[in-house]
A protein has these predicted regions:
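Flexible, glycine-rich surface segments
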Residues: 68-69, 88
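Short coil/turn segments at beta-strand junctions that form active-site/ligand-binding loops
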Residues: 70-75, 111-114
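Short hydrophobic beta-strand that contains or immediately precedes a catalytic carboxylate
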Residues: 73-78, 91-94
Length: 177
């Protein structure tokens, strides 16, 4: 009986030691760093952008009024496919995956330009053109943070959830499909 107990204790101790060492080995085998991906920097900018965003959210009426001002750009960062189905009249499409220094410099050379953004989660009752994302994955959030990261501070976001069929914002399909 004593021998069985010793063997059992030895096995348990060996298992516990191996389990405790596993996280250390995993840390040592971490993938190499990528200088083009900076999670800490992203989170810092995201927090700063979130504070900025608090005072840059617009009602439907204010969005409509400002969208008619000369020099204001309404930016739709959804896919071209969704943009072509339905978008705010006058909006310019720059898919989120295409937001780069070069494309922004081409489309918005002046970082002081007023930019109005909206996304899928601003419209309901048209899932084909505006498929709903999880609230924490809303394209407005990613777009706002990206523009802020690239130095654009005159960015305003459409705040409310609107019915695509009754909104005062004119929604149109692209004619160049």
């Amino acid at each position: 009986m004593k021998t069985k107990l010793r063997v059992l204790m030895y096995c348990a101790l060996t298992y516990c030691t191996a389990a405790a060492a596993a996280p250390m080995q995993a840390r040592e085998a971490a993938p190499p760093a990528n200088p083009q991906i900076d999670m800490r920097g992203y989170l810092a900018v995201a927090n700063e952008a979130a504070a900025h965003r608090n005072t840059h959210r617009l009602s439907e009426a204010d969005f409509l009024r400002l969208s008619n001002d000369p020099g204001t750009v309404v930016l739709d960062a959804r896919s071209k496919e969704k943009y072509d189905l339905l978008h705010v009249r006058g909006a310019v499409n720059l898919s989120f995956s295409d937001i780069t220094v070069a494309r922004l410099a081409q489309l918005l050379p002046n970082k002081d330009t007023r930019i109005l953004i909206y996304c899928n989660n601003n419209f309901r009752n048209n899932e084909l053109a505006f498929p709903t994302k999880m609230a924490t994955a809303s394209l407005n959030l990613s777009t706002y943070i990206a523009l802020y990261t690239y130095g654009y501070r005159n960015v305003y976001e459409l705040a409310p959830l609107l019915d695509a069929g009754t909104t005062k914002l004119e929604l149109v399909a692209s004619t160049r499909r």
